[in-house]
Regions:
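Cell-envelope/glycan interface and biosynthesis
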Residues: 1-167
Length: 167
């Protein structure tokens, strides 16, 4: 499916893949590492464990091996990517990959006033560009991460009203 999106990139533009399939062991390591960062970044220290887990799940999947609900990256159905322009530089998407802030939400720049702010408009347009390329190719987007797209996994299946292709 990614080749379909790549075919629609303008001449000289390329996808840069940061992450795709990952084993459960790596998913567990990332979950542990990122959980504490997310708690600090979003000031979740005073929430219950259950409330913290709910917020953390917006950014990284719990690595519990579950054949019915495996984390997207462990199925091979998820990809984290960006776009490189013909000048060899990444397009500006407003945050780094795997940043944990409100600005990482795919629609963040759709929800703020960007009039008169050329940088914010550029970021919004770059996110729209990536989003439309991937959605037109059949992917789904994880709303909390502008760089994360899925095809064939449980989240994609829920959105598409289909059965998951990858488990």
């Amino acid at each position: 499916m990614l080749y379909r999106a790549a075919e629609n990139l303008p001449s000289g533009y390329k996808f840069v893949i940061w992450d795709a399939w990952r084993p459960f062991a790596l998913q567990k390591e990332l979950f542990i590492s990122y959980s504490s960062k997310i708690i600090k970044e979003f000031h979740l220290e005073n929430l219950t464990s259950e409330e913290q887990e709910h917020e953390i799940a917006k950014f990284i999947a719990d690595p519990i091996p579950n054949e019915e609900l495996p984390p997207a990256h462990t199925t091979g159905g998820a990809i984290d990517l960006t776009i490189m322009g013909p000048d060899g530089k990444y397009l500006d998407f407003g945050t780094d990959f795997d940043a944990f802030t409100e600005k990482t939400r795919a629609a963040y720049y759709e929800t703020i006033d960007v009039e008169g702010d050329s940088k914010a408009k550029e970021i919004r347009n770059n996110r729209r560009f990536l989003y439309n390329l991937m959605m037109d190719a059949g992917f789904g987007n994880l709303p909390s991460e502008w760089w994360h797209y899925e095809y064939g996994d449980k989240n994609w299946a829920d959105i598409q009203g289909k059965s998951a292709l990858y488990k």
